[in-house]
Structures are given as structure tokens and as C-alpha cells.
């Protein structure tokens, strides 16, 4: 008896959603497994409550899932430490709590929809750092375009990212804050350009445009943000070939006698009922921490050290962003709490400059009022000092006048930055906890030292009145874009999957999340690249399964 599904997809985020979309539209019956719930924006998102900016909307992987060894900080790095949110520490501390739910990280992402520039695919060849990809920008460009059309991306063409067609929607108008930063950039001989965003700037595909409430991180109640649950999975569900199973934790990948993937073992619901699901194709898209965790836990006589781990590469080369976010006060209130979160960015430094001490590319972005500082309540709790009348006066004076510049650089891949299982420390589902080892290096510090004065230079040229503080990956990594732990490459000696996200060792197993990225894209957000890769991988799997 044949299984009821042709393909199983684990993880309903960016990569899993696009894989499910492509597979169902190709005629395959797909089971999409998600450990979190399906959210109802009207019921579950907090934007209608007065305290909406003070809490967290989405379920998270529990803190006891991961163990991270802190890293002592250098005594001479005080100027790089976090000063906002009253965070003071003598060591680097991590919190790898990922959002769980249908939509994955796109539930709370800020909508950035970036292509990686062509040079990001050839970092080793061009600049002698990082790794080269097993595919080129030109090969991925058609898939970028298709995903942009599906999501209704709003943007403006830029020479760094060659394209053969315009964006589906025009860019969002610059906020008053970004207009000030754009004027400052012009004074410096630089250009602040509109950000490309998976947030609708006009009605598109039956969905309304953005209302500029700036609540993207807490879930979009309007439906203009193109999260996977809103813009992608409904298209797959219309085929009648998609089954979504929520509240399901995958514990093992199962192999048949030939060494091919035949299914998964799952614990379903609060009662943790064990079930086995089978299919002829398997896509893992649980993220750069959970996907290698699942692979390492799926030991067998063929793979005694973990599935696909013949060469000890699963879980290695973990990358996180190197970032500095500087908060400033303008002399007047500019409604910085309104608009899309990051509506403009400076791309002058996306091309690396090894001779100038910057082997990684980076971007500077106009953030306005960042998450956690977007309402009077959250702002009052975090930034202005003082008590009583003085505190109230400072909140009244500075709220809406505060704006952030974000410097975002990629971290170079290093094999020693890795994760491994703690077999003697199971979590609530019996899956071993994960130990994460990531070191902040001299290269990372050089990038911070480079970005801080550039942020201040732009702020000064734009007329800011004062600096309010900063948040920094020097001591407070936010782990927004972890990637690289199941990296793609040419062969099994130095990679786990090929350029189609197909595993070298198990040919009917694909990985379609950020874990496959060999590098981070020189300061660009990864979700659009993950989605383009997933679309390409799914079409390859369909063709390969038909003998094409």
C-alpha cells in the first residue's frame, strides 16, 4: 500500500512554505509538519491592546532547549557594549529562542526581501574569505523574480542586484526619519535607497496595502505583510493537496534498507502521541538550529554519528549577524514610531573591501523607532532616565524623535562555530538538548569598529541632537539570521547538500532553510534567498523523481 503523501516537509517557515507551494502545484500530495500552532491574526495578534509592544506574540522554542557557553568580553571593548534596555554584562550571552508556528520566522520578520548580490556567491574566489556557492546569482535570479511576484515585493531597482523585470510593486515612501537620513547621506556623497520589502505598497493579489502601524514584529493584522501563512500557503491549500499538521515535533528521520529517507517519527499534541509518516520525498526546513539537531539525532547503522554526517560537517560553520544598532535623538519629533520598520538602507559598503580591513560586506539601515521602543510605554521603560516629572518630560520630548541606524555585517563561516547534542540532557520530547559554541572573533570586532563611526557620521550629517545608546552583537547577539549549519557545496568532503539543496548522501532528502547558506550575503536579509532556493529545490526534486 502506497503512503498517503508524496512528500513530507518539516517546518512551515520561509523554506518549508515555498517547498510546499511548489510541490503541491506540481501535483504532489504534501504533509507539512509544524511544531507550533496556526495563528489567527484577528484573535492572536496584540496590536489592538494598549500593551502590545511590551510582550511577545508568538510561541518560542523553550529556553531549556539550548545550552550556550558564554564568552568573556575584552576589557578594552566597553565602547562596543550594549547600553540600551539596561543590559550590562561581562560576557557574551545568547538566547536561541525561535518562533514556532505556521509561517515560522516570517511571522515576526520585518519584511525585508533582499536578493544577495552576485559577489556574495563568490566570496572565496573574489576576496579570499568565506566560501563559494555551488551556484551563481544568474542561476538563482529567475527564482528570485518568481518569489518576488508571489509575495508582491515593493522595491526599487539597484545596480548591485541585476534584474530583468521591475519589482511587482513600487517602493514605500520614505518616512520623515529616513528623509532626514537620506539628506545626510547626500551631504556625505552617499545614497540612502528605499528598502525592498515583502510588505505591500498598494493593493495586490486581493490583499490591502500597509497602514504603517509598524507592528510587523508582533504579527500583521491587516494582511499586507507577505508572511508565508498569508501569501504562500493559501496558494498551496487551494490545490487540495496540502495537509498541515500543527503541534507536531519530529524526533527522527527514518531510512529504508537502501539508505533512502522513507519517513519521520513524530510526537503529536500535548499528549505526545507517537506516529510515523512516510513519503518518497523529504524536505527539512526547521531552521539552522533545529534541522541539524534533527539530523544529528537521527542516528542509524549507516549514519552512526548522525544523518548526513559522514564527514562531521552537520552543525558546523554556524553564522550569526555582526550588528551595531545606534539610537539617536533628533531635535524635533518625527513620528519615528510610524511606518515600515526599515524603509531605507545605505548599500555603499555591501561590496567587501579587504584592503580597507573589511573582508565582509555590510549595510547601514534607517530603522526609525525599533522594536521594543515603538510605544510610549515601552520607550518610557527603556530609554529616558529620571523619575516623576523629569521622566515624563523626557518621554514627551523624545518619543517620536528617537531613531536608530542599524549596521549589519555577515560573520565569516568557521568550522569551530558549531552545535552538538547533549545526549544525557533530553528535552521534554526526549530529544537531546543542543550545545552551541560560537566565538566572537577579531574579524567580527573589526566590523563593529568600522560600522560605529559610519553610523555616527551619517547621524551627524542628518542633524541628530544626541546619541541615546546602542545595542551590539559584541555582548548581546540577537541571532536573527542563524545559518550555515548544513551548508551547500560541490562535494560531500566540504558540504552536506548540493546546489539544489539535495543531500549528497541521501538523494531523496532535501534541506530548504537558512542552514544551507554557505555565506550570509554581505549584510542582506536571507529570507528571500531561502525562499528562492526552496522553490528551485522543489522543482529539482519533482524532476528528479520523474527521472528528469
Regions found by a protein language model. Name each.
Residues 7-32:
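N-terminal Rossmann-like FAD-binding beta1-loop-alpha1 element of flavoenzymes
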Residues 25, 29, 36-51, 239, ...:
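Glycine-rich loop(s) and the adjacent beta-strand/alpha-helix scaffold that form part
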Residues 37-63, 99-108:
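Conserved N-terminal glycine-rich FAD pyrophosphate-binding loop of Rossmann-like flavoproteins
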Amino acid at each position: 500500500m502506497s503512503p498517503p503523501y508524496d512528500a513530507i516537509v518539516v517546518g512551515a517557515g520561509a523554506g518549508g512554505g515555498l517547498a510546499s507551494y511548489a510541490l503541491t502545484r506540481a501535483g504532489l500530495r504534501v504533509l507539512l509538519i509544524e511544531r507550533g500552532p496556526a495563528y489567527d491574526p484577528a484573535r492572536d495578534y496584540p496590536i489592538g491592546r494598549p500593551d502590545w509592544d511590551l510582550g511577545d506574540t508568538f510561541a518560542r522554542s523553550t529556553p531549556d532547549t539550548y545550552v550556550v557557553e558564554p564568552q568573556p568580553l575584552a576589557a578594552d571593548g566597553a565602547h562596543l557594549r550594549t547600553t540600551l534596555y539596561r543590559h550590562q554584562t561581562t560576557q557574551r550571552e545568547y538566547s536561541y529562542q525561535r518562533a514556532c508556528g505556521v509561517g515560522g520566522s516570517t511571522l515576526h520578520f520585518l519584511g525585508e526581501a533582499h536578493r544577495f548580490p552576485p559577489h556574495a556567491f563568490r566570496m572565496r574566489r573574489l576576496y579570499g574569505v568565506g566560501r563559494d556557492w555551488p551556484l551563481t546569482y544568474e542561476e538563482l535570479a529567475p527564482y528570485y523574480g518568481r518569489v518576488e511576484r508571489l509575495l508582491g515585493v515593493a522595491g526599487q531597482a539597484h545596480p548591485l542586484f541585476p534584474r530583468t523585470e521591475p519589482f511587482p510593486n513600487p517602493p514605500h515612501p520614505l518616512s520623515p526619519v529616513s528623509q532626514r537620513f537620506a539628506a545626510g547621506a547626500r551631504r556625505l556623497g552617499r545614497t540612502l535607497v528605499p528598502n525592498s520589502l515583502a510588505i505591500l505598497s498598494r493593493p495586490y493579489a486581493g490583499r490591502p496595502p500597509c497602514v504603517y502601524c509598524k507592528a510587523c514584529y508582533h504579527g500583521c493584522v491587516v494582511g499586507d505583510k507577505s508572511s508565508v501563512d498569508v501569501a504562500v500557503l493559501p496558494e498551496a491549500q487551494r490545490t487540495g493537496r496540502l495537509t498541515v499538521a500543527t503541534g507536531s515535533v519530529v524526533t527522527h528521520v527514518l531510512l529504508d534498507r537502501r539508505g533512502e529517507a522513507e519517513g519521520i517519527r513524530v510526537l503529536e499534541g500535548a499528549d505526545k502521541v507517537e506516529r510515523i509518516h512516510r513519503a518518497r520525498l523529504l524536505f527539512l526546513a526547521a531552521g539552522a538550529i533545529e534541522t541539524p539537531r534533527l539530523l544529528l539525532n537521527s542516528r542509524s547503522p549507516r549514519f552512526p554519528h548522525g544523518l548526513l554526517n559522514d564527514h562531521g560537517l552537520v552543525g558546523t560553520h554556524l553564522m550569526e549577524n555582526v550588528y551595531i544598532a545606534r539610537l539617536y535623538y533628533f531635535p524635533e519629533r518625527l513620528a519615528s514610531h510610524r511606518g515600515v520598520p526599515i524603509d531605507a538602507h545605505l548599500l555603499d559598503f555591501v561590496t567587501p573591501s579587504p584592503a580597507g580591513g573589511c573582508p565582509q560586506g555590510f549595510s547601514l539601515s534607517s530603522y526609525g523607532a525599533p522594536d521594543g521602543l515603538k510605544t510610549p510605554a515601552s520607550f518610557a521603560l527603556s530609554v529616558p532616565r529620571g523619575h516623576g516629572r523629569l521622566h515624563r518630560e523626557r518621554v514627551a520630548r523624545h518619543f517620536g524623535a528617537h531613531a536608530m541606524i542599524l549596521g549589519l555585517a555577515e560573520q565569516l563561516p568557521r568550522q569551530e562555530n558549531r552545535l552538538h547534542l547533549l545526549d544525557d540532557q533530553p528535552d521534554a520530547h526526549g530529544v537531546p538538548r543542543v550545545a552551541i559554541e560560537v566565538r566572537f572573533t577579531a574579524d567580527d570586532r573589526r566590523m563593529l569598529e568600522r560600522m560605529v563611526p559610519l553610523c555616527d557620521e551619517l547621524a551627524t550629517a542628518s542633524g541628530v541632537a544626541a546619541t541615546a545608546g546602542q545595542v551590539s552583537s559584541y555582548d548581546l547577539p540577537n541571532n536573527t539570521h542563524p545559518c550555515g549549519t548544513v551548508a551547500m557545496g560541490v562535494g560531500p568532503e566540504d558540504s552536506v547538500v548540493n546546489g539544489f539543496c539535495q543531500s549528497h548522501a541521501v538523494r531523496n532528502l532535501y534541506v530548504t532553510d537558512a542552514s544551507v547558506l554557505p555565506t550570509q550575503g554581505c549584510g542582506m536579509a536571507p529570507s528571500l534567498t531561502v525562499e528562492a532556493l526552496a522553490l528551485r529545490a522543489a522543482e529539482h526534486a519533482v524532476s528528479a523523481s520523474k527521472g528528469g
